Amino acid sequence: FTALKVIRAYYADHNQPNRTVVLAADTAHGTNPASCTMCGASVETVRSVQGQTDLEHLREVIQHVGAENIAAFMITNPSTAGLFDVNIKEIADIVHEAGAMLYLDGANMNAMVGRIRPGDFGADAMHYNTHKTFSTPHGGGGPGADQLSDTSH
């Protein structure tokens, strides 16, 4: 939720308040559409094929919605099925070409800690939950104990 609010604020600050659509992979964490709705964004779902984002469908959705209206593409990687989307760099390129941001939901970040750096595959913003990634109590012992990261822009 917070990263989406930051993304929306970024575009409002850069005279692009029309960017109110968030694309979400059909493999994304189940709470992602609710987060989008809570911060005033509409959601368009992008299909997957065998757990991998359908790149052609991603392009079609961008064309249908209009690149100028898209704030971000939200993906959980690895997905809730435990699959790593191997096309993540190409996804980032497609999303960035549309002028949008790649938002990584790190719900399953524990599979990647110490192995890869999400910034290397083009994530502009991400969060991860300490209760899943580092085995802390849900909420990290108190509400709101998540990590939020973003790029310099």
Label each PLM-derived region with a short phrase.
Residues F1-H153:
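Conserved PLP-enzyme active-site core in the AAT-like
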